């Protein structure tokens, strides 16, 4: 990846400062971007630690997704620098700490202040859902505050490297914010999980306490699964209406992001720039800021190369400088993607021909974005977008799993159960038949039908992937296959063969 300084030092473009924190994969340090003088936070992800936790491929994938996000209330990722030992993730620096500490210090907030935070959170969550990314670990500790007390959702995507079905084993945080379907290991599509967590956060903002809290974990789980909590009498009628609609145990009956946006409590004093979702990234990059362009050109970069790099979303010294300068200008002048910016964006996008939009979407998918239709649906909310990843079926979950296991057997795929409806698999065209290893009833038993081979048997001709079954809002079930490692083309061959074997999808 581009990003190394001119002296060969991977971080030569930055002056490294003190350590801000230490996480599971490594440290986070403050740094100064030398060309612009702006501060950034550099997350140092240790490759050895990531590999030992089998997270390497997922971390890379989620970073690619996060690099495309451009939203005022999501921490911006400016640059990713790869070295043999570490991955350096250069991100927006915010200095006012976590929303968690803010709540602890101030206690319950007045409705106006709580609503302002909540509007920003929902806007950021909605943006990610529209781009087919779910956080699954939203909590005040992951919500940072900048110098103007604006919310920044942190680790969006990076926190989502946890395997489905492994939430309690892999999450180092508290399950207080987790939805019932998550801690129960039930099927879930994703967006509803974040709505529940946002409901817990809203409760904490308005009440200064958590709705579900107990030192005894089994008791805590019982409260969450039963939706057992109390609403304080000081809450306004509209707040008392919204919170219970978010904390509905059945995810299919839970309020949606769009319905939250339309709720009377939410719409009070809603800023103009949050009144509609921001443009998709593919459209945002078409609008370039002339003043910022000139600033970067004055640093010695070629204008044509800079514009081309920005349109193609390339990462290099010039584009990193551009976005650092642009973000700082928006913060200090018109605010976070303020109304003026939106109006100029709208007028610019109105001139974009329909033929341009699909190409832009395609370009972004090639740069690591999750493939999804509807990139150009500017005015559609998250609830209008259909989550159509994977294969859909109305068959019973057990029937689907039975057919999946039959298909895996026919293809000589080894598998191991890691969740109720989640398994990790390994396939190599050269493997001999493993039919004798499969369960005759084709269902999840106490043991898994995976052959544990030693390292000598692993080769570049082996594909590792995961299968997860989800439930969608329209009472369908969705089967998703996700490559973990191995040749991409070999994985596509497997998917094609797998499709021909299935009988219920």
From Swiss-Prot:
Gene that this sequence comes from: OSK1
Source species: Oryza sativa subsp. japonica (Rice)
Disruption phenotype: Reduced expression of MYBS1 and AAMY3 under glucose starvation. Accumulation of MYBS1 and AAMY3 in the presence of glucose. Retarded seed germination and seedling growth.
Pfam families referenced in this protein's UniProt entry, alphabetically: KA1, Pkinase, UBA
CDD domains for this protein: AMPKA_C, STKc_AMPK_alpha, UBA_SnRK1_plant
Molecular function as annotated in GO: ATP binding; protein serine kinase activity; protein serine/threonine kinase activity
Protein's name according to its UniProt entry: Serine/threonine protein kinase OSK1
Gene Ontology cellular component annotations, sorted alphabetically: nucleus
Principal location: nucleus
Disordered: annotated segments: 347-372
Domain Protein kinase: 14-266
